[in-house]
Structures are given as C-alpha cells and as structure tokens.
From Swiss-Prot:
Subunit structure: Type II secretion is composed of four main components: the outer membrane complex, the inner membrane complex, the cytoplasmic secretion ATPase and the periplasm-spanning pseudopilus. Interacts with core component epsG.
Compartmental location: Cell inner membrane
Post-translational modification: Cleaved by prepilin peptidase.
Gene3D superfamilies named in the record: GSPII I/J protein-like (3.10.610.10), gspk-gspi-gspj complex like domains (2.10.70.20)
Protein name according to UniProt: Type II secretion system protein J
GO cellular component: plasma membrane; type II protein secretion system complex
Species, as recorded: Vibrio cholerae serotype O1 (strain ATCC 39315 / El Tor Inaba N16961)
Length: 221
C-alpha cells in the first residue's frame, strides 16, 4: 500500500511534457509576432500621418507666401545687375533666374520696415523658379540691385515636377505675358506634385498700368 501511494505521488509531481512545452512556445511566439506586427503598423501609421501633416503644412505655407507676394505686386520698374530699368514690370521667361523651366520676376510692396530698423526697403524684388524639383522664392532687399548682387533663395515646396503660370487681363487668360507697363488682374499658378498630382490656385493682384515715362524719370532721380 505504501509503495502504491509513493508511485502515485511521484506521478502527480511530474512536470510538462516536451510536446506541451513546444506547443506553449509556439503559441507564445505567435502572440509575440502578432503583437509586433500590430505595434509596427501603428508606428508606421503614425509616421505616415506625421509626414502627410508636414507635407500639407509645407504646401499651405507656399500658397500663403505666393498669395502675399501676388497681392502686393507693384507698378514699378526694377534694375538688375546695375543695368537700365527693365522694360517689363512683370517678367515671365524661360530660364529666368536660372530656372529649369520658366521663371517669374516682379516687384512687391508691403514689406514693413518700422523706422527703417532693418537694412532693406519696404519695396522688394521677388522671383519664383523651379530648380531641381523644388519651387523656390528668390528675393532681394531692394528692387534695384547693383552688378553681382545675388538674390536670396528660399525653398518653398519640394516634389514639384512641373509648374506653369497664366495671367488674366481684360477677360482673357494668357500663358505668356507681353504688356510692358501693366500688371495682370489675376495670376493662376498650376503645380504638378509627385504625391498630390496637379493643383491650381488663382491669386488676385492689384492690376493697373504704369506711365513708363514718369516711372523712368523717377527711377533716374
């Protein structure tokens, strides 16, 4: 009787079998892999969300800056590299500003300089170009610049495959800008982005025309 109880006690104290251990390990491994995949997906989703938020902020910032520039277009000639005043107060030309495509150049108002605290005027020369798939803003502290003075370059938007500008005047849109003494009533900017495709924005300007003779006299003075 005593031996039978001893054998039964030993059997009750026996541990897990090898198969049970392997099954437990397999289940634990499966749960670990599943948990890792879920965690990885959540982390990747957060990264994608952050990237898209940053991209939208970049796009919105570029649009706001362009809106401010176009709304403040000035009826004023400008000088580049110390040369005579430009014939056009708004230039839209191939390779202008070393652009990979067309470049845009004009003068803008509204750059406040209270009590002349900063080494610049309140009227600035501003340009836009497409360079290595980036939309860049090129600007100068003054509208009339001496020879050799380079503009300051501010990257606005990355991933730009193509860009185009159209000009609205007297009820018609034009892909070229011919008038020498006038500004368009509106500017349409079309951008083709790698991620968002083609987007289009229309910006109003002050419009108007300039007496070139009077402007030339004022610039000469």
């Amino acid at each position: 009787m005593w031996r039978t109880n001893q054998v039964s006690s030993r059997q009750n104290m026996a541990g897990f079998t090898l198969i049970e251990v392997l099954v437990a390990i397999a289940i634990f491994a499966s749960l670990s892999v599943g948990a890792y995949q879920v965690l990885n997906q959540v982390q990747r989703s957060n990264e994608i969300s952050a990237e898209r938020t940053a991209r939208l902020a970049e796009l919105q910032r570029a649009m706001v800056i362009m809106d401010a520039d176009f709304r403040q277009m000035a009826l004023r000639q400008f000088r580049t590299d110390g040369e005579a005043p430009s014939e056009q107060i708004l230039q839209w030309k191939e390779s202008l500003l070393d652009s990979d495509q067309h470049g845009l150049l004009f003068v803008r108002l509204g750059w406040h300089n209270p009590q002349q605290q900063f080494p610049r005027g309140e009227v600035a020369k501003v340009g836009y170009r497409l360079f290595e798939n980036r939309l860049e803003r090129v600007w100068w502290r003054y509208p009339d610049t001496p020879a050799g003075q380079q503009g300051l370059i501010s990257p606005l938007l990355t991933g730009v495959e193509d860009w185009a500008v159209q000009f609205y005047l007297q009820g018609e849109w034009s892909k070229e800008w011919v008038p020498t003494n006038a500004l368009p009533e509106a500017v349409k900017v079309t951008l083709r982005l790698k991620d968002y495709g083609e987007i289009e924005r229309i910006y109003l300007t002050g419009g108007g025309s300039l007496n070139m003779t009077q402007e030339s006299v004022e610039n000469a003075g």
